[in-house]
Amino acid sequence: MQDLCEMWRHAVARVLSQLQGPAVEPVEGAQLVMEEPPEPGMGDIAFPLFLFAKRVRRSPAQLAQQLCTLLEEDTSMCAYGTPQARGPYLNVFLNKECVAAHTLDAIFAQGERYGHTQYLQGKRIMVEFSSPNTNKPLHVGHLRNNAIGESLSRIIAFCGADVFKVNIINDRGVHICKSMCAYQKFAHGKTPAHTGIKSDRFVGDWYVQFNRYAQQYPEEAEHDVRDLLQRWESADPHVRALWRTMNEWALRGIKQTYERTGISFDKLYFESETYTKGREEVRRGLACGVFYQMEDNSIWVDLSSLGLDKKALLRSDGTTMYITQDIGTAIFRAQDWPFDQLLYVVGNEQNYHFKVLFFVLRLLGYPWAQQLHHVSYGMVNLPHGRMKSREGTVVDADDILDRLHSAAEEEIAKKGRENALKHAQCIAENVAIAALHYFLLQVSPQKDMVFHPEESLSFNGNTGPYLQYMGARISSLLKKVQEDVEQKGPREVRCDPALLTHEAEWELVKALARFPACVTRAAQGHDPSVITGYLYTLSKSFSRFYHDCPILCEARPDYACARLELVRAVRIVLRTAMRLVLIPFLEEM
């Protein structure tokens, strides 16, 4: 349908250019706004004419009528639809037969590649997301970050880009030493294996324990952790050995959560391996005169050209800042995998940080610094409010997943399906993943959100499990058709998309036809919620079609055949769109 819409856009632009006359610059198709009418009875596409009416000295309604007359005389366009003047708009009723045939042919020819576009063909795009600390497990904020980063990576790859997913592991600094300090003092040699606690949670428990210790003995705690940090900086072998052990524990558990939620990376970077490069670059910038040094030997950058004040890049004792390691990491990445664009998926509390980071890298003379982009997103909380790792009030990602899994199991048991389903445990896990990812991705990334586990698991309405239910229902229908064919033999009926003219069929065909444009729009806006919104629209269109248009009990074989083809097309697009937003497709539920 997008091709037909563009065809009409260019046809309208061509006629507008004729009306303007040769003395005026021709109208380009891209200048024409194309909208979807609010009601089906008003057509399929609409062109507002307010802007162009002034150029030809007519009212918008007069211009719409004249355009309609001229386009009706264009026999080459008559096969693709009918123009109609609607006040200040030129509306077009597309040729249903043409759109249905074109859309279904494209879906069956391309299969699960349908929707793939060339928008980013040839581009190399690196995506950074997750960025965990090795002193605690992943929490709900990481779940939103991971979902956005992984989904966005899949979407831009589907638009033709070569995508490289990276993760910076924050494995050094005061916060890491806090867990190490508490472990040294209070663990008495315990390990995750001894306690049966998941390894990242085991490390996180010591981070909480340190903060309890610091509340009781603040001076001693401050001294202990600073001493540990200095010994780490000096490469004390005993401190480094403990650091490696606890980091390995934390990272092992974090990787298990990644695997559980379908998150993967092409390369991991570690702050402990990049911060020294950042320090070297800051000192080089000082030597080049782009930074300046204070009397205490700390190094700063002037941000007045950004409308800001100044920013410290290196402390007076030569120790690094948070921004220092990001400078080094960015340089290593550009060397490792030269990119056309690097997207940082990081929460909006870091907006200032990335504005400064990109500016600093430009000052250092790196041309690729112009290609850095911060994909900022809002905070996510649970209904009981904000969470704090140091107080132990954070709800781990695994806790949320376990809770969703248990609730999905209960729902399966409630429906009496646990015995009928061969892999009920696996299905419950996939339902939990669908509930989580759809809920996190249905909100525009820029907005703050509250994650409601119970709402996310609903099998009715705008949820991941509902989409899975729809997919399973379609699969069940097609399986039954296949069984009938095997028993009775195939029907000698030609499937003709031209028969799909019922209003519910037409709305479903148009929904399928819009998918490629939705993928491109999601990539352009770095916004997976475009796809989740599309899936909700598709599910509503299918439900209406399923209710209004009989399939198995349709007495006319040719109509039944055409509708079955439409159902098959829906399954293909549904599966593809669900994959882009990390929702497992289920054949049965």
From Swiss-Prot:
InterPro entries: aa-tRNA-synth_I_CS, Arg-tRNA-ligase, Arg-tRNA-synth_N, Arg-tRNA-synth_N_sf, ArgRS_core, DALR_anticod-bd, Rossmann-like_a/b/a_fold, tRNAsynth_Ia_anticodon-bd. The keyword Transcription does not apply. Keywords: Aminoacyl-tRNA synthetase, ATP-binding, Cytoplasm, Ligase, Nucleotide-binding, Protein biosynthesis. PROSITE patterns: AA_TRNA_LIGASE_I. GO terms for biological process: arginyl-tRNA aminoacylation. It is found in: Cytoplasm. The keyword Ligase applies. SMART domains: Arg_tRNA_synt_N (SM01016), DALR_1 (SM00836). It comes from the Bacteria. It catalyses: tRNA(Arg) + L-arginine + ATP = L-arginyl-tRNA(Arg) + AMP + diphosphate. Monomer. Belongs to the class-I aminoacyl-tRNA synthetase family. This is Arginine--tRNA ligase. It comes from Treponema pallidum (strain Nichols).
